[in-house]
């Protein structure tokens, strides 16, 4: 989703800029009013160099994505870092470039990509708006009057299913891995992949777990338990 603002990068780093974009795109895509409901929003402030290195080893890249879809006639929106394949289209959108991927029936998948910042794109957008005003062909921001757009119920975020990435910094001792997996199973989170890297010098180990899909509710409850447990010195997920 492009560069962070040099003066105040907070809105870019905490995901709010992407959040604003996905709300506008949802309104355009689904012909709805801009949602005022809460959505899952997580930025990239907590991602560490270690996470980037691990993703690279797995053939993956970390990308901050805004996702919107209609589930059972309800609107689901989320913004959070995702692990994507290095070989995927979205995995190769870098630098100042932005990309929007749409999927529908029967049209399938469409991709739009372009620069999201810089003097060229910014001045082009401003000039386009000014010319529209001068020509007198101003249209409503969403094509039709906002009041004519329909409202839609929000999807319960806690019921959304997704995979989970966890990285633990633990004491290298017997039973720690078993303790962590037991906590995961308590919330019906099944493990898809485990990587354990020992640090013999400091008598510690790094454990990386990627789960199968599970609900946001299970993920949230499990993380709350892991953050407060003595199973790990540091938890990132």
What is each residue range found by the language model?
Residues 1-92, 97-99:
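Substrate-binding/catalytic subdomain of NAD(P)-dependent oxidoreductase enzymes
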Residues 109-159:
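C-terminal, non-catalytic macromolecule-binding modules
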Residues 139, 143, 173-192:
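Short amphipathic alpha-helix segments
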Residues 158-170:
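Short glycine-/aliphatic-rich beta-strand segments at the starts of folded cytosolic domains
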Residues 180-184, 221-227:
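Short amphipathic alpha-helices in soluble, non-transmembrane regions
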Residues 187-206:
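Cytosolic Rossmann-like ligand/nucleotide-binding regulatory domains
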Residues 230-237:
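Single conserved hydrophobic/aromatic residue that forms the stacking wall/gate
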């Amino acid at each position: 989703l492009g560069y962070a603002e040099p003066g105040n990068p907070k809105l870019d780093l905490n995901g709010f800029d992407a959040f604003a974009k996905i709300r506008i795109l949802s309104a355009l895509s689904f012909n709805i009013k801009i949602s005022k409901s809460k959505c899952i929003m997580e930025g990239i402030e907590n991602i560490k160099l270690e996470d980037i290195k691990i993703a690279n080893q797995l053939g993956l890249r970390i990308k901050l994505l805004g996702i919107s879809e209609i589930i059972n006639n309800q609107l689901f929106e989320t913004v959070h870092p995702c692990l994507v394949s290095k070989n995927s289209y979205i995995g190769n959108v870098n630098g100042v470039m932005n990309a929007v991927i749409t999927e529908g029936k029967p049209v399938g998948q469409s991709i739009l990509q372009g620069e999201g910042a810089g003097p060229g794109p910014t001045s082009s957008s401003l000039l386009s708006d000014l010319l529209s005003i001068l020509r007198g062909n101003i249209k409503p921001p969403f094509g039709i009057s906002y009041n004519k757009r329909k409202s839609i119920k929000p999807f319960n975020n806690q019921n959304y299913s997704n995979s989970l990435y966890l990285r633990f910094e633990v004491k290298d001792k017997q039973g720690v891995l078993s303790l962590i997996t037991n906590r995961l199973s308590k919330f019906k989170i099944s493990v898809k992949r485990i990587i354990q890297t020992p640090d013999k010098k400091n008598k510690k180990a790094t454990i990386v777990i990627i789960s199968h899909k599970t609900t946001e509710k299970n993920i949230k409850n499990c993380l709350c338990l892991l953050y407060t447990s003595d199973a790990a010195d540091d938890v990132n997920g």
